[in-house]
Amino acid sequence: MDTLIREFDVALRAIAGATRAERANPADRLAPETEQMNPEERRHVSGLMRINHVGEVCAQALYQAQKLTARTPAVRAQMDAAAKEEEDHLAWCADRLRELGSRPSLLNPVWYAGAFAIGVLAGRAGDKVSLGFVAETERQVEHHLTSHLDRLPTTDSRSRAILEQMRDDEVRHGDAARNAGGIPLPGPVRALMQVASRVMTTTAYRI
């Protein structure tokens, strides 16, 4: 029962944007630069950071579901450790959205519920499949973050610092999942994940 209460609290905080980072925000070492962006650039960066915030909401749901369905304590511990770092990402993205005078996606409860359901399916397929799903998810997120870094205004070093640290963490999470025994996912599954990602990114940019 205590575990369920704790996990429910994690879900509520992720959806409500009430998470707190354990690590320092990478942007804290930089001076505020938002005022150097024109209104169009600020709207664009807000859209990108909203997408990244949604991605971290989904990451919390995925890791939570896969942790609850893991077959072994080792995999459960690995999912828990990664989820804590992803919680840092969630808090950093929320901080940046506030700095930009923007907001998270209004559809966060929907994104969370959908990602949790997918995580349960991956977890029930077994630890090797679940770890493979983590590895593929992190690979796609790495590419997505690289794309966002390319699309940031040159003056926005604060968002850049956050996304670069997030990308480094995602690469490490993916490598850890593969090294722990994650197996490659079938091509159709990878393609379906990419389609779902495009739907999320297109919608979250605006809503």
Swiss-Prot record:
Cofactor detail note: Binds 2 iron ions per subunit.
Function: Catalyzes the hydroxylation of 2-nonaprenyl-3-methyl-6-methoxy-1,4-benzoquinol during ubiquinone biosynthesis.
Cofactor(s), by name: Fe cation
Catalytic reaction list: a 5-methoxy-2-methyl-3-(all-trans-polyprenyl)benzene-1,4-diol + AH2 + O2 = a 3-demethylubiquinol + A + H2O
Species annotation: Cupriavidus metallidurans (strain ATCC 43123 / DSM 2839 / NBRC 102507 / CH34)
Gene: coq7
The protein, known as: 3-demethoxyubiquinol 3-hydroxylase
Topology of the protein relative to the lipid bilayer: Peripheral membrane protein
Keywords: Cell membrane, Iron, Membrane, Metal-binding, Monooxygenase, Oxidoreductase, Ubiquinone biosynthesis
Location(s), subcellular: Cell membrane
Coiled coil: none
Stated family: Belongs to the COQ7 family.
